[in-house]
A protein has these predicted regions:
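Surface-exposed binding/hinge segments that line
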Residues: 91, 134-177
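Append "and occasionally in soluble cytosolic enzymes with long acidic Gly/Pro-rich linkers
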Residues: 267, 287-374, 379, 439, ...
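Aromatic- and charge-enriched surface segment that lines or borders ligand/interaction sites
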Residues: 88-129, 145, 151, 285
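Ligand-site clamp/hinge motif
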Residues: 211-256
């Protein structure tokens, strides 16, 4: 007994020692993760990053962190108009050529100056990536003119090229640092953004530190820590206890509670994203258009919007939302149970069938799936909800392991090319975005025309036609264009919502 007691004491003392001597990633915010002062911002989000390599994944939890580490050639203003970032200016000698003039004196986090060779390396690396190459599809040449000048040529005119170059994944990397890190670059990133990488404790936190030589000036807050806190109730508790300064994407009763608490500030506004129910059209019975149509007529969006989102959003109807240029208000599907049953019978399922829906470990999507489960039961579909960890969810839906799934998509470039091409082009099936594995030659042709048409009105007509076809083909059912929200402690100032839902911390202060 004494030996066991002695062993227990030894274990406890060892654990206390380890906590006291925690690694570098913990020292900046304390071993508990609690905020230690004005020099540190602790942010709670609902999922861990998949990779900090911008060319390795295109997911929101990763983008929230990467937008602090990297800059791009272009940025967008609040109206979605392209603005200079690392490219100071540009000119178009013809419809298929853009010459970019780079800012001088921009430093990477390893101390090297950004040069045209880094831009060429970065764009060519993005073009070679199966995850993000589709964003730059059509570029056929990147040429270094001198240290601060780069020429980009395209096969055909690219109407959205400046918008696409603003995409968070099209970051400019240090060629030297990227090659030195090799396959480990995603865990040891080097960019030229306002914050540099310090550490990543997988599943828990990513720690960043202000970069003193940032070309726009050093960020006001020295340290930023992103905490992976899946349950929004736990994010709320973290804010209430003072362990968190900022929390992202709070829904339900927690949001109302925080809205009414004078200690906090709720910032809510529109975004360029939508939440959708996707169908894997590689698998039966989802390859049958009558089945997809039946499911669409079985759904009533209102209980989802009212109960899960507490009214914070509007019913979806098209593949891009009203905050994206080119949106067309196609007719919504209105719940009609008898029509849905008749369509299922025509498809050969008079008694319905068993089905599975994938959601990631996001409470909002789980709650949405529960309502869908109840609604589809009315037409005989017995729906099983499977919760899949975020990284496994992305990998599995890229392979096509799923049946139905709930996911979101943000048209972060504010241009319909990105809002549509990634989701419905035959060329982007899988990881690039088309997780419904939808293929329609007519749509593919129209998408290519939309990419190259420079006349805005003709372009808008092309995207209107695509939206009408998607409404009929239903590779996905658009559930909601949700509002986004962030809740901060009252002493956090200058936080601005990004319509693309990847919030830049540069400029935020803590009093």
């Amino acid at each position: 007994m004494k030996k066991k007691f002695g062993l227990l004491v030894t274990i406890i003392l060892s654990m206390l020692f380890l906590v006291a001597c925690g690694g570098n990633g913990d020292k900046k915010e304390g071993a508990s993760g609690a905020n230690t002062g004005k020099d540190t911002l602790v942010i709670g989000q609902g999922a861990d990053a998949k990779s900090l390599d911008p060319h390795a994944s295109n997911d929101n939890p990763s983008s929230n962190i990467r937008v602090q580490i990297y800059d791009r050639l272009m940025d967008l203003d609040e109206n979605g108009v392209p603005q200079p970032m690392l490219a100071e200016s540009w000119e178009r000698p013809d419809d298929k050529t853009i010459i970019f003039h780079l800012r001088k004196g921009v430093k990477f986090h390893n101390g090297d100056e950004m040069k045209a060779s880094d831009v060429k390396f970065s764009l060519e690396r993005a073009l070679a990536s199966p995850e993000v190459s589709h964003i730059l599809a059509g570029i056929n040449g990147v040429e270094v003119i001198d240290d601060y000048t780069v020429k980009v040529t395209t096969e055909k005119p690219m109407a959205a090229i400046l918008n696409n170059l603003s995409h968070i994944t099209i970051a400019i990397l240090s060629e030297k640092a990227t090659k030195e890190a090799g396959d480990k670059f995603g865990q040891n990133p080097v960019g030229s953004g306002p914050y540099k990488f310090v550490s990543w404790q997988s599943g828990d936190r990513v720690t960043l530190e202000a970069f003193p030589e940032y070309w726009q000036g050093e960020a006001p807050v020295k340290n930023v820590v992103y905490r992976n806190i899946v349950e929004e109730t736990n994010r709320t508790i973290g804010l209430e206890t003072g362990e968190l300064d900022i929390i992202y994407d709070i829904q339900g009763l927690d949001k109302n509670k925080l809205r009414d608490d004078e200690r906090f500030v709720l910032i809510e506004g529109p975004q360029v994203s939508m939440t959708y129910l996707g169908f894997n059209m590689k698998k039966a019975p989802y390859d049958n258009p009558k089945v997809r149509e039946a499911i669409s007529y079985a759904i009533d969006q209102k209980p989802i919007i009212d109960t899960v989102f507490l009214g914070a959003g509007e019913a979806g109807n098209s593949i891009i939302g009203p905050n994206v240029w080119g949106y067309y208000d196609v007719e919504k599907y209105t719940q009609d149970i008898e029509k849905a049953k008749a369509l299922l019978a025509e498809a050969g399922f008079p008694n319905g069938f068993k089905a599975k829906i994938w959601v990631n470990d996001n409470p909002v999507r789980r709650d949405t799936a529960v309502i869908l489960q109840d609604q589809l039961k009315q037409i005989g579909i017995d729906l099983t909800i499977e919760t899949v960890e975020w990284g496994a969810f992305l990998d599995g839906t890229a392979r096509g392991d799923h049946e139905m799934f709930l996911l979101g998509w943000g048209t972060v470039t504010r241009d319909p090319d990105y809002g549509m091409y990634e989701l419905i082009s035959t060329s982007t099936m899988g990881a690039a975005g088309n997780r419904s594995f939808y293929s329609n030659p007519t749509v593919d042709k129209l998408l290519e025309e939309g990419k190259t048409e420079l006349d805005p009105e003709k372009r808008k007509a092309i995207y209107k036609e695509i939206q009408e076809i998607i409404r009929k083909d239903i590779p996905m059912y658009m559930i909601i264009y949700p509002l986004q929200n962030v809740v901060t402690q009252k002493n956090i100032k200058n936080f601005k919502l990004d319509p693309a839902n990847a919030h830049r911390i540069y400029g935020v202060t803590k009093e």
